[in-house]
Amino acid sequence: MDNLFTFLHEIEDRYARTIFNFHLISCDEIGDIYGLMKERISSEDMFDNIVYNKDIHPAIKKLVYCDIQLTKHIINQNTYPVFNDSSQVKCCHYFDINSNNSNISSRTVEIFESEKSSLVSYIKTTNKKRKVNYGEIKKTVHGGTNANYFSGKKSDEYLSTTVRSNINQPWIKTISKRMRVDIINHSIVTRGKSSILQTIEIIFTNRTCVKIFKDSTMHIILSKDKDEKGCINMIDKLFYVYYNLFLLFEDIIQNDYFKEVANVVNHVLMATALDEKLFLIKKMAEHDVYGVSNFKIGMFNLTFIKSLDHTVFPSLLDEDSKIKFFKGKKLNIVALRSLEDCTNYVTKSENMIEMMKERSTILNSIDIETESVDRLKELLLK
């Protein structure tokens, strides 16, 4: 981890990170994080009864548990603004909301109707304006006009699906769904699967998302703010997430190890100089501290922050290159999966930029109208 941050610091005058996600590999000695969090979230409907430590409340926006039988959101109401009618997302026609109408539940209903939650994304995705049923096309081909075509309503206690078709093309379906949602206090509950993955998610107020899988491996998607400047800000954001995450684990799992790790993490946050932060991170790696010793890069992108004032020559890019140009002028390096990957493509990017500058200078010095076609091909296509 310290070597990655050291390199990102070395190039931060030219490159800034955009997407950055990573994994914390499961360790047997820390216990069943997934199982204990699942048990706590499943049995409670008040945020305070899950997250006891009030010091970390401002950092955590939402907890989500999703498996095949149940999807449950627990929201921290204090982290949401007061919504007005003009800010509401028009999603009511996707849901039947059941609530006990208490003040707490009514506020949760207001939040649910106003924010773009994963339930909204899921139900919008599963509502298909047009879908071809290829099985019914085969029936038409092989069975003639007597083939049966389904249209109508299918439903269970929590999901109603309406399938409509055109009489002239009955194999083309329009599918609409409505989902029942139960809202009690801080909890938003629906039955059945509402995600591809079975995970527990912790959504932070800074938009960082932590996904915990069944084996307690974690996937962390680190958010990026416009005011993030350089590697030191990135380290502070990551370790701020660590600090609050580990105190949450100590809260739920009752394992003092996480409190000890949170204290070590806090030393990194309190350090003011980058060199001191990197030194402390290196020491954490040497002592096999959770969060550093089991850190594994998932994928990250870099963007070249300086302006490209010369002509861009796409022909210099390999077909499978991770160097991409956005809108012709913005250079991005995408899908980097290791420090070696990063250093390799940054070097390629630097060399390519120099070559483009040289070609651009030549191109600007010649008369395009009189120059030979072969010479122009050499500049533009090779």
Swiss-Prot record:
Pfam families for the chain: Pox_int_trans
Induction: Expressed in the early phase of the viral replicative cycle.
Organism superkingdom: Viruses
Keywords, ordered alphabetically: Activator, Early protein, Phosphoprotein, Transcription, Transcription regulation
Role noted for this protein: Acts with RNA polymerase to initiate transcription from intermediate gene promoters.
Subunit structure: Heterodimerizes with protein A8 to form the virus intermediate transcription factor (VITF)-3.
Family per similarity comment: Belongs to the orthopoxvirus OPG150 family.
This protein's name: Intermediate transcription factor 3 large subunit
Originating species: Monkeypox virus
Gene name in the database record: OPG150
